[in-house]
C-alpha cells in the first residue's frame, strides 16, 4: 500500500382535524387492485390511481391560516415492489380544488406538484407528511407550506441502503435503487395525470437534503435516461416519462466518485476532525470500528439513526486525530483534484474558464472565494455580525477578502480522509454501493487502488447511474429547466467545490440555476421555505 504506486486517474402528523370519506382509511392500506398472494414479491399492484377511495379530509394551520386538504396515503407506485412500504407514496391535494377553487392563482389544472423526498445518509426515505412543526422547529414543514401555497404534494417513500426485501434477508435498497424509485414515482404521477383530481404533471418540482439533495439533483439531471430502464422495468414502473420541471437541492452529497478529492482540496492540512453523531450511531449499528474509541461512551445512542439525523447532523464534541495513513492519502487526494476540475472545462457567468494549477490555486479557487465573499457580504448587508469569522476580512463595512487557507480550521473538519470512500469500507456511501448481501464496496479509483487487497469495486454502471455529472449536457437525458442549489457557508459534510461544480455544469449546459451559499449555515435543508416557494412560484408562473 505505497502511495507512489497510486495511479491518480480519478411523520407522524400533528393534531389533525379529520373526517373519514369514501372507504374507511386504514394506516396500512395500499392502492386498490392488489392480487393477494402469500409472497409480497408475487403481488401485482395496480398503477391506476382511484381518487374516490381511501382518503381523509384533514386540516392544519400555517401562520394562522387553516389549510384544508385531502390525504391519500400508502399508494404503491410500482406494480412489483421489492418492499411495499418503501415504495409507497402519499398524495395531498388542497381541498379548494375539489370545488374548482383557486389558491395563489393556481387552479386544479395548473397547480405545481411538489415532490419532496425524505432520504438522508443514503438511508430509506419515509413518505413526508404535512406538519405544523418542521425539522428546525420554527414553523410548518415544506409539505404543509406547499399545500398552503396551492401546490399538490406527492411524497414518495424511497428505498435506502438498509431496506430489506420480502425475505427479510436480501438488501434491496442499494444503489441505484433510490433514483429508480424516485423516477418510478414521477412515472406513476404521469400515468395518472387524467385520474389525479389536481396537479400539473408538467410542473413537478423535486426537493431533498443531503443524500436526498443529491437524489433530487440526480432526478433533475437524468430525465428519461435509457440506462435506468432495466431497473424500472424490474419493479414494474409505469411506462411514462420521468423528466421533471425543476429540482431543489439542499447540500447535495453528490459526485461521490470525486467528492474525496474536493474535500481534501479544501481540508488538507487540518488533521483533526469531529464526526457527526449520526455517523457514530451508524458505525456502531453496523458493527464497525468507531474512531477515537467512542463506542459505548455516554451520549452515543445505541439505535440506528434515521434519515433526518443525517439531514440535520449534530457534531460530536470529541476531537479525533487522523492517522498517518489518512494524512498521507489526504495529500494524494488533494493533488488529484486540479486535474479533475480542469477536465470539466467549466466557465463562470462571464464565460471565463475556471481552472486550477498543480498547487491547487487558480480561477476555480477564486470562484469559490467569491461565493463565500458574497455570502458574508449579504450577511453584513442584513445587519449580521461576521466578526467571529476570522477568515473573513472586512474593511469599512465591506467584505474585501476571505482566507481559504484559514477557513478549514475555522469551520473544522468533519470527516477523515478519504471522506466518502473509506479505505476500510466503513462509510455510509460504501454501504450504499454495497451488494444484496450487504457487503460494502469502493466507488472511487484512488481508494480502490490504495486499498487493493480486500475491498471490491462497485461496477462502473452503478457508479455512473449515481452521478448527475454523467448525464448533464450529454444530449440524451432530459435535464430539468430549473435548479435551486444551496450549500451552507459552514457546511463541512462535503466541500462547496462539489456543489459549485454541479451548479456550473448545469449552468454551462443552458440550465437556469439559482446557486447560493447561505451565511453561517451548516448541513441542513428547508431552512428558507419562503424563499424556496417564491422561487417555485416565479418559475411556474413565468410566461
Model region roles, listed by residue range:
Residues 342-465:
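Long, low-complexity, polar/charged, intrinsically disordered or flexibly structured peripheral segments
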Residues 89, 104-122, 126:
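Short beta-strand element of the alpha/beta-hydrolase
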Residues 171-195, 528:
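Alpha/beta-hydrolase active-site loop
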Residues 116-180, 222, 521:
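Cap/lid segment of the alpha/beta-hydrolase catalytic domain
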Residues 191-270, 300, 463:
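Primarily recognizes the serine-hydrolase "nucleophile elbow" in alpha/beta-hydrolase
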Residues 19-34:
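Sec-dependent signal peptide cleavage junction
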Residues 33-108:
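Catalytic-loop region of hydrolases
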Residues 166, 259-265, 298-385, 488-491, ...:
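C-terminal catalytic histidine-bearing segment of alpha/beta-hydrolase fold enzymes
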